[in-house]
Regions:
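Beta1/beta-strand and adjacent pyrophosphate-binding region of the FAD-binding site
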Residues: 1-15
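Conserved N-terminal glycine-rich FAD pyrophosphate-binding loop of Rossmann-like flavoproteins
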Residues: 37-57, 71
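An active-site-proximal "capping" alpha-helix that borders the catalytic cofactor pocket
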Residues: 56, 290-307, 313
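C-terminal helical "tail/cap" subdomain of flavin- and related membrane-associated enzymes
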Residues: 302-384
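Glycine-rich FAD pyrophosphate-binding loop
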Residues: 21-44
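Predominantly flavin-linked oxidoreductase catalytic cores and closely associated redox partners
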Residues: 106-240
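A conserved beta-strand/loop capping segment in the N-terminal third of enzymes
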Residues: 53-104
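FAD/FMN-dependent oxidoreductases across multiple families
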Residues: 122, 139, 220-300
Length: 384
C-alpha cells in the first residue's frame, strides 16, 4: 500500500476535481482517483448556470476561453408550437469532455496527485483510516475519503432510490443542419414526448447536445431500441423532429445510464463525504447539476479545512439544496406523464412568464451562494 494521504477523492468529475484543487491549494496531500484514463464524454446536459460560472472562475478557469457558448433562451414544446422565453439569468454550454479535463489539469497544478485508469472497487474505514481497493488490485489509504463518483454508485455505498427512480438517460452529440442550427441559436429547447423529455442545446465546435430521459416502461414498450425511441420522439414532437431532421450523429451510439435516483438528497452523514450527484441528484431539465456539484465541493473544502466533520457538511449541504431538488423533482414528475405535460403546456400558453419563473425557482438559493463566499448578484449579471 502507498503512503497515507490526507484526502482521497474518488471521482474526477466536476465535484471531485474542484474539491481536490481546493484542498491541494491549501497544502493538503490529495490523491484523486478517476476510472477513465483519458478525456471522455458523460451523460450530462452540459448546462452551466451563472452560479456554476462563478465557482469555475473562483477555481481559476475561464469557461469562455475553453469554448463555452452562451445560452440565452429556453423553450418547451409538445405536439404544438414551442413556447420560448429569455432565461432570467446568464447561462453557457460546455462539453464535459473539455470541462472535466480542464478541471483535472487545474487540480494537478494545485498539487493534487491524479491516478487515472483504475477506479475504486471498494471503500472501507479501518482503524480511523480509509482504504480503497482499485480495479487494478492496488490499495490506497487516506485520513478522509470523499465520494464524488457522479451518477455511478460504488459497491457498498449505493444511494437509495429517489422519488423518481424509473428513468433512463441518453446523450448524443450531433451536427444539426445549418438552418436548424441557426434556428436553435443560443437556446436550450426542452421537447416533451409520451414517457419522457429531451433537451437540445448548442455546445462548442458548432455541435449540439441531445440529452433525454425516458421512463423505463415506455422504452421497454418500444423494444428497448434507440432507433425506435428516436422515431417515437419525432412522431410525437414535430418541433424536435424538425430540429433533428438531417442531423449527423457524432458518435457511433448514444451514451446511456439507468437507475438514476432523481430527487435523492443525502441528509445525514454515513462516514465519508458525499459530493455532487452522490449527495444530491436534481432532474436534468433544471440544468443545475454542475452548480450543485461545484457548490458541494467548495462547501466540503471549507468544512474540512475549518475542522468540521462529514456529518456536519452533509447536513449543511442538504439544507442548501433540498428545496430546489424537491421543486425540480415535482416538475420532472409532471414532465414524463401525459396529463402533466398537458397541464404544463396549457399553463405556459396562459402564463408565458411561468417558464422563466420555473427556471429561476430551480437555482441555488442566494443564501447558499453567500455561504460559499459568492455574490448572488454576480450570478445574475450577464457578460458585457
Amino acid at each position: 500500500m502507498s503512503r497515507t494521504h490526507d484526502a482521497l477523492v474518488l471521482g474526477g468529475g466536476v465535484a471531485g476535481t474542484a474539491l481536490a484543487q481546493r484542498l491541494a491549494a491549501a497544502g493538503r496531500d490529495v490523491l484523486l482517483v478517476e476510472r477513465q484514463a483519458g478525456p471522455h464524454d458523460k451523460v450530462c446536459g452540459e448546462f452551466l448556470s451563472g452560479e456554476a460560472m462563478l465557482y469555475l472562475r473562483r477555481l481559476g478557469l475561464d469557461p469562455l476561453a475553453l469554448g463555452a457558448v452562451p445560452v440565452e433562451q429556453v423553450s418547451v414544446s409538445g405536439r404544438g408550437r414551442a413556447q420560448r422565453c429569455r432565461l432570467p439569468f446568464p447561462a453557457f454550454s460546455l462539453s464535459r469532455r473539455r470541462l472535466d479535463e480542464a478541471l483535472l489539469a487545474a487540480a494537478a497544478t494545485a498539487g493534487a496527485t491524479l491516478r487515472r485508469g483504475a477506479g475504486a472497487r471498494a471503500l472501507d474505514c479501518r482503524g480511523g483510516l480509509w482504504e480503497a481497493r482499485l480495479e487494478d488490485g492496488s490499495q490506497v489509504a487516506a485520513r478522509q475519503a470523499f465520494l464524488a463518483t457522479g451518477k455511478h454508485d460504488l459497491r457498498g455505498w449505493r444511494r437509495p432510490p429517489g422519488p423518481q427512480p424509473d428513468l433512463l438517460g441518453f446523450k448524443l452529440h450531433l451536427r444539426l443542419r445549418p438552418d436548424e442550427a441557426a434556428a436553435l441559436g443560443q437556446a436550450v429547447e426542452i421537447a416533451l414526448f409520451p414517457g419522457g423529455y429531451a433537451g437540445l442545446q448548442p455546445v462548442e465546435g458548432g455541435h449540439a447536445n441531445l440529452c433525454l430521459l425516458v421512463r423505463r416502461g415506455h422504452f421497454a414498450a418500444l423494444g428497448g431500441e434507440w432507433a425506435a425511441l428516436q422515431r417515437h420522439m419525432a412522431a410525437q414532437n414535430p418541433h424536435l423532429a424538425s430540429r433533428l431532421a438531417g442531423a449527423t450523429p457524432l458518435w457511433e451510439r448514444p451514451l446511456a445510464i439507468a437507475a438514476i435516483p432523481y430527487g435523492f438528497v443525502q441528509r445525514s452523514g454515513d462516514g465519508c463525504w458525499r459530493l455532487g450527484d452522490q449527495a444530491a441528484v436534481i432532474p436534468s431539465f433544471a440544468g443545475e447539476g454542475m452548480s450543485i456539484a461545484l457548490h458541494s465541493a467548495h462547501l466540503a473544502a471549507a468544512c474540512h479545512l475549518g475542522g468540521d466533520d462529514a456529518a456536519a457538511f452533509q447536513r449543511r449541504l442538504a439544507g442548501d439544496v433540498s428545496g430546489l431538488v424537491r421543486r425540480a423533482t415535482l416538475v420532472s414528475q409532471l414532465l414524463v406523464r401525459g396529463w402533466g405535460q398537458a397541464l404544463l403546456l396549457g399553463g405556459l400558453r396562459g402564463l408565458p412568464f411561468a417558464l422563466a419563473a420555473t427556471a429561476a425557482a430551480t437555482r441555488l438559493p442566494a443564501a447558499a451562494l453567500r455561504r460559499g463566499g459568492l455574490d448572488p448578484a454576480e450570478a445574475l449579471a450577464r457578460p458585457a
